[in-house]
């Protein structure tokens, strides 16, 4: 972070300039450009799409057909208006392919239970953090109107590239 008085480069977040002692607390610590978009943007800015919702009692073959039909890499498992789990293509491959017949598999056995859910007014940085730390490629989003959206890693990349 550059001091506005003497121009010395200081460490990000420094309270006092190393060169002249200027009070740096009044200098904006927000990065410019890409970093600023990540810190200041909200998930609503990413325009999450509607989630594809199934129930925990739905059959695995019917869920696979729905995912293919909708060209979606994941579905949310919702019962009683509450997100109970998320099922991704990766879950299907690791849980079914070569292990058990899809007709014999149960959705609750394959899904990730109680996924992290964010809100539309959360910062974009929350989505990056949760996806990075959790190794997720999809995050459910609770909308202000009570609906449920879905955010993907592709949505984050699209946001950053605009």
Segments (PLM) and residue ranges:
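Tandem CBS (Cystathionine beta-synthase) repeat/Bateman regulatory domains
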Residues: 1-162
């Amino acid at each position: 972070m550059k001091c506005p008085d003497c121009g010395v480069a200081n460490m990000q977040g420094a309270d006092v300039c190393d060169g002249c002692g200027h009070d740096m607390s009044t200098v904006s610590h927000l990065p410019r450009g890409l970093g600023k978009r990540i810190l200041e943007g909200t998930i609503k800015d990413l325009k999450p799409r509607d989630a594809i919702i199934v129930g925990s009692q739905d059959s695995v073959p019917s869920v696979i057909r729905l995912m293919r039909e909708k060209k979606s890499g994941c579905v949310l498992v919702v019962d009683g208006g509450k997100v109970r789990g998320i099922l991704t293509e990766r879950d299907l491959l690791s849980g079914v392919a070569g292990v058990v017949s899809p007709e014999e598999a149960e959705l609750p056995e394959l899904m990730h239970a109680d996924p992290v859910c964010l809100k539309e007014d959360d910062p974009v940085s929350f989505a990056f953090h949760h996806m990075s730390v959790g190794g997720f490629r999809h995050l459910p989003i609770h909308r202000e109107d009570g609906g449920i959206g879905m955010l993907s890693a592709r949505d984050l990349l699209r946001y950053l590239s605009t």
